[in-house]
Amino acid sequence: FSGVDSMFSLVNDLLLSNEKSFLSKGSLFSHGDLCFSNMILSESEDSIIFIDPRGGDSFRTPYYDLAKISHSLLGGYDHIINNKASICFNSDMTAFLDFDMNKDKSVKDLFNSFLESGDYKPEIVALVQVSLFLSMLPLHIEDTKKVYMLALRASELISGIKDHKNR
């Protein structure tokens, strides 16, 4: 990618080309910020407590909350924000993120099976997830390394979507 603007443009074009599928699920009640840092596991009650819901518009496409979960589960958002990721370089000096998660594809496969069982398209969840990474850039502008990692992760995910479409 030539820059963040080209990523925004591509994601926008891909979302618009999938608009019918994206909107097909209608609007449901939404937490609005369904990431791991807003979940508390209560072992004594054998439950998960969701905190810090977004106010305002409580109804959204379910793809949004699914993408927020994927953002944490598969995207590595929490690893980046909590400084648990590293920027590395291949022999050709191509940058990539290294973080200790998803080495085992079973989590991704299980999540994608869950999506497909509800007739949700994993590629649309991935597109929304990329838009989330891009939308986080100005929120972390005080930390150049995090901004670079968020943009790099968005780029990696877009490349994965493009590779999937080319199969």
Feature-to-residue mapping (PLM):
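A short beta-strand motif that forms part of the nucleic acid-binding face
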Residues: 34, 54-55
